[in-house]
Amino acid sequence: MRRNCNAGFKSPVQSPSSSSSGRGSEYSLQKEVSELQGKEAALDQEIAQLESEGFSMAELEEHITLLHEYNELKDVGQMLLGRLAVLRGVTTKELYAEFGMNLED
C-alpha cells in the first residue's frame, strides 16, 4: 500500500480562525489574567507572612544560591564516581560502599 505524499496534512494545532470566537478567546484570556492576579496576591500575602515571622527575601535568595552551588558540586562528585567506576570496572554502587557513602545521598 502506497500513501499519497501530497495528501492534505491536518495539523493538531488549531489556527486562530478555527478556534472559538473572538469573544470566547478574549474571555478565556481575561479569566487567565484574573487567575494569575489571584495567585500573585496569594504569593504576596505568603511573602508578607514569612517576613512578619522574621524571614527575609535576601536570606531566601542566599539559600537558593547555596543550594544551586551544592547541587553543582554534587553533580561533579557523581561524575567523578562514575568515571572512577568505569576505570576500576565496578559499579558506582560498589564505590558508594567502599567510600562509606549512603546511596540515598
Swiss-Prot record:
InterPro entries per UniProt: DNA-repair_Swi5 (IPR010760)
Gene transcribed to yield this protein: swi5
Name the UniProt record assigns to this protein: DNA repair protein SWI5 homolog
Compartments reported by the entry: Nucleus
Record function comment: Component of the swi5-sfr1 complex, a complex required for double-strand break repair via homologous recombination.
Record's keyword terms, sorted: Coiled coil, DNA damage, DNA repair, Nucleus
Cysteine-cysteine disulfides: none
Biased composition (Low complexity): 11-28
Entry keyword 4Fe-4S: no
Coiled coil regions in record: 28-54
Family note: Belongs to the SWI5/SAE3 family.
Key word Cytoplasm present: no
Gene Ontology CC annotation, any one: nucleus
Stretch list, region Disordered: 1-31
Record GO biological process: double-strand break repair via homologous recombination
Quaternary assembly: Component of the swi5-sfr1 complex.
Main localisation: nucleus
UniProt organism field: Xenopus tropicalis (Western clawed frog)
